[in-house]
Amino acid sequence: METGFKEMNLTEKQLDSTEIFNGKLLRVFKDRVLLPNGEESTREYIKHIGAVAVVAMDNEGRIAVEHQFRYPFAEELMEIPAGKLDSEDEDPLEAAKRELREETGITASEFEYMGPFYPTCAYSNEVIHLYFAWNLSFGERSLDEDESINVEMIDLNKMVQLIFDGKIPDGKTQAAVLQVVARLRAQ
């Protein structure tokens, strides 16, 4: 069946770039670009060093979930353990192991990379590398000075229901948890 959709060139070319802000967490840029139709436009976007997020599941089918206050939303959110890379060349797997251990005290002997997640692709280049971890051991946490996090283990099926009920607004948590469910069902 013919749809009438026509394929077009989508690539935009950067003409120049100006850094507007350089902070601890992110950098903001304003670029002038050439559009595929020949017109010029402006793109404002955030550059982020990147991050990791981990679904850590124990032998009872429970996953580690964090409760933390998120200032931009002025509310406590439930999320999987996550954190930013320490440098642009840091191995994401090593960052995932570090963040899981620091925030929850959990170490895992098995990790599977589930792929990249782009949380805000319209205005940021942030990439969150998603991991599934199992064969867990529990120890002491070592939170950063600016972190206040409560941790609990929640049944994976209950977490899925919380997502479907709209109780987990965090995108990386939704994507990673549902991907784990799909992977487990495919086995």
Where are these regions (language model features)?
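Acidic, metal-coordinating catalytic segment for phosphate/diphosphate chemistry
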Residues: D16-A53, N59
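Extreme N-terminal tail/first-helix region
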Residues: M1-N22
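Conserved Nudix-box catalytic region and its N-terminal flanking loop in Nudix hydrolases
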Residues: N9, R43, A53-R98, R141
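Generic C-terminal helix-cap and adjacent flexible tail
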Residues: A182-Q187
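Unchanged
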Residues: S41, G50-A53, K84-G171
